């Protein structure tokens, strides 16, 4: 069923609420247009009841001009199909005899996502929205090898990414969908850690954002308050309180930001509308990870007036701020 009109916090909106929200979101709509976001959806998110709403929100980003690369996982689905498989530090040790099942499951998950983006029924937000979802052999992989004395067999890692081809597809208004599989130059398939692959792709593309969906909504301070922003150097303060999976995702986010990705965000896949609230409101709802501040904060001086006027101009034009003379 279609979602009821609601403000992003979950409250119903009247016409005035809609008007105010759109005015407030105008600067973000303008800022995100033409930017590249790499979005990670794990197998837990794919199995959750909210996945259809998440896809609709991603479709909205696409319509607003955001260039999207979507990387999916499949851990719980593989755990169910391969109950005897072993893991090491959150990585599956991929036996050669398991690859057919793994590629089959990833194929089903990819097809499921393609189907969700193709939903064009009249009572859905995707009615009359044409989204081309493209997958391909963009990832060249190599074996992960032996770690801590353990041979990871057909578990692999990124060797290279066809970034030029992905950018070409994004520029042509396609959404790129990547499964956690890669192939060697000889054609051997490798099973990749999906969180690490998402970070690797964001780094290779020098994406503007890397977005991870997780079960938890955000990090919390020692006083159980939401931590809206962290840096790679402050991440260690929170890792001990996270599950292994969540910790691995935050470490992947940190690695991406250190390598040049502008921002990384963690959002709950349980929270309906969480993606839109994080990206189009000042307060957000998740936790964002940014690089250490390169420039010190200082008080404004008279010479800054012109730049400040330009910064607030979109807010004045949208009606969010009252226009004033200098």
Model region roles, listed by residue range:
Residues 320-322:
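A short gly/proline-enriched turn/hairpin at secondary-structure junctions
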């Amino acid at each position: 069923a279609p979602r009821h009109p609601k403000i992003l916090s979950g409250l119903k909106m009247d016409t005035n609420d809609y008007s105010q929200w759109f005015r407030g979101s105008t600067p973000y709509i303008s800022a995100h247009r033409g930017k590249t976001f790499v979005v990670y959806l794990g197998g837990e998110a794919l199995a959750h009841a909210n996945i259809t709403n998440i896809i609709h929100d991603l479709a909205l980003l696409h319509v607003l001009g955001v260039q999207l690369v979507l990387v999916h996982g499949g851990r719980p689905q593989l755990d169910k199909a391969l109950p005897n498989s072993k893991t090491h530090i959150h990585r599956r040790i991929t036996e050669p005899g398991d690859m057919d099942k793994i590629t089959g499951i990833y194929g089903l998950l990819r097809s499921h996502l393609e189907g969700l983006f193709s939903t064009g029924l009249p009572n859905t937000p995707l009615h009359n929205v044409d989204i081309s979802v493209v997958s391909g052999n963009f990832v060249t992989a190599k074996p992960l090898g032996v770690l801590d004395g353990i041979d990871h067999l057909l578990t692999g890692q990124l060797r290279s990414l066809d970034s030029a081809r992905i950018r070409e597809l994004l520029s042509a208004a396609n959404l790129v969908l990547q499964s956690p599989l890669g192939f060697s130059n000889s054609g051997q398939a490798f099973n990749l850690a999906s969180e690490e692959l998402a970070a690797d792709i964001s780094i290779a593309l020098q994406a503007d954002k890397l977005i991870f969906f997780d079960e938890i909504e955000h990090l919390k301070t020692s006083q159980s308050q939401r931590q809206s922003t962290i840096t790679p150097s402050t991440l260690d303060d929170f890792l001990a309180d996270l599950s292994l999976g969540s910790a691995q995702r935050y470490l992947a986010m940190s690695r991406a930001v250190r390598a040049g990705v502008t921002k990384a965000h963690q959002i709950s896949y349980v929270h309906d509308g969480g993606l839109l609230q994080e990206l189009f409101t000042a307060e957000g709802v998740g936790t964002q990870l940014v690089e250490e501040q390169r420039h010190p904060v200082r008080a404004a001086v008279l010479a800054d007036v012109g730049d400040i006027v330009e910064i607030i101009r979109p807010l004045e034009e949208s009606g969010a701020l009252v226009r004033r003379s200098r």
